[in-house]
C-alpha cells in the first residue's frame, strides 16, 4: 500500500523544510488518475498538492512548465484564471519519488479562488455565455502560443506510444479481439489525421477535461478560475470541444461518463459553437 501522505511530506521537505505540515487531507474528486491533497501548515496557511503516477515524470514536469508560462503570459481578463504552481529558484518545483515499483511525482499549487459554479444543466443563455467566454479564452491562448516552451507530446506521439504498448504489453489490454480493435482504431486515427492535414492546425495550450467541477465564473458568467490540469496538451483547440459538448449537453454535467459521440450532435452544442465563433 502506497503511503501518499509520506510522499507529500518528502516532496515538501525538498521545497521548504522550515515550514511544518500540520495535516494532509485527500480532496481528490475521485474521477481522475491524479490524487489531490490540501496541505495545511502549523500556521494554518494551506496549499494544494497534486500527486500523479500516470504517464512519465518528464512529461509531467514539461506540462507544468508550459502551464506556468501560459498562466504568466495570459493578458486581461485571463491573467489570474489559471492556478499557479509554486516556484523554487524561479522554476516550477516538482518532486519525484521512486522506490521499488512505486514511481510518483508531486507539484504544489497556490489555492484557486472559487466564485460561482455553473449548474449541472445549463439553460440556453448560460450555453451562449460559456461559448463566448471559451472563444475569447482560446483566442487569448492563441496570441501567446509563440512564446511558450515547446512540447514533446503530440497526438501522433500518443498513438505511437499506444501502438508500442499494444506490441510489447498486449496482455494489459484484454483478449486478442480487444487488442486488434485497438490496433485498428489507432491506424484509422492516423489515416484520418493525415486526411484532415491535422499537422497544419494551430497549436495552442488546451486544458481538455473541462467540467463544472474544475472552473468558476463571475458576473455575466465570465471565466474566473480554472484548476485541475489532468490532460493538458499543446494541441488543437478541437480537443476541448468534446468536453464542452458534455458540459452543455441535455443530460447535464455528470461525475460518471461514457465517451459517446452523441453530445456533439445535440442542438445545444451547436448553439455553443455558434456563440463561440462570434
Walk through the language-model features, giving the residues of each.
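Active-site acidic catalytic loop and adjacent metal/ATP-binding pocket
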Residues: 32-41, 48-49, 191-239
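Active-site activation/catalytic loop segments of kinase-like enzymes and analogous catalytic loops
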Residues: 239-277
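A conserved alpha-helical element in kinase catalytic cores
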Residues: 52-101, 125-128
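An alpha-helical support segment within catalytic cores of ATP-dependent transferases
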Residues: 8-16, 146, 165-208, 218-221
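Protein kinase-like catalytic domain
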Residues: 71, 138-145, 249, 277
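Conserved short submotifs of the Hanks-type protein kinase catalytic core
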Residues: 102-114
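Juxta-kinase regulatory segment immediately upstream of eukaryotic protein kinase catalytic domains
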Residues: 1-25
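A cross-family kinase active-site recognition segment
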Residues: 120-178, 203
Amino acid at each position: 500500500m502506497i503511503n501518499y501522505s509520506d510522499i507529500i511530506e518528502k516532496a515538501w521537505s525538498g521545497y521548504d523544510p522550515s515550514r511544518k505540515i500540520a495535516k494532509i487531507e485527500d480532496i481528490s474528486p475521485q474521477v481522475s488518475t491524479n490524487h489531490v491533497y490540501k496541505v495545511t501548515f502549523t500556521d494554518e496557511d494551506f496549499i494544494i498538492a497534486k500527486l500523479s503516477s500516470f504517464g512519465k515524470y518528464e512529461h509531467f514536469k514539461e506540462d507544468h512548465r508550459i502551464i506556468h508560462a501560459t498562466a504568466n503570459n495570459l493578458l486581461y481578463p485571463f491573467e489570474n484564471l489559471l492556478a499557479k504552481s509554486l516556484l523554487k529558484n524561479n522554476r516550477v518545483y516538482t518532486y519525484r519519488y521512486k522506490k521499488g515499483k512505486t514511481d510518483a511525482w508531486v507539484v504544489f499549487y497556490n489555492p484557486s479562488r472559487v466564485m460561482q459554479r455553473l449548474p449541472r444543466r445549463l439553460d440556453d443563455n448560460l450555453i451562449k455565455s460559456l461559448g463566448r467566454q471559451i472563444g475569447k479564452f482560446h483566442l487569448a491562448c492563441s496570441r501567446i502560443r509563440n512564446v511558450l516552451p515547446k512540447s514533446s507530446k503530440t497526438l501522433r506521439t500518443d498513438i505511437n506510444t499506444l501502438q508500442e504498448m499494444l506490441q510489447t504489453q498486449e496482455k494489459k489490454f484484454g483478449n486478442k479481439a480487444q487488442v486488434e480493435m485497438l490496433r485498428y482504431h489507432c491506424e484509422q486515427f492516423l489515416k484520418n489525421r493525415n486526411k484532415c492535414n491535422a499537422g497544419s492546425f494551430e497549436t495552442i495550450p488546451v486544458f481538455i477535461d473541462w467540467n463544472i467541477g474544475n472552473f468558476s465564473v463571475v458576473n455575466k458568467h465570465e471565466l474566473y478560475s480554472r484548476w485541475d490540469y489532468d490532460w493538458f496538451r499543446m494541441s488543437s483547440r478541437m480537443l476541448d470541444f468534446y468536453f464542452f459538448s458534455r458540459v452543455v449537453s441535455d443530460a447535464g454535467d455528470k461525475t460518471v461518463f461514457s465517451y459517446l459521440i452523441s453530445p456533439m450532435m445535440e442542438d445545444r452544442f451547436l448553439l455553443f459553437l455558434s456563440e463561440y465563433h462570434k
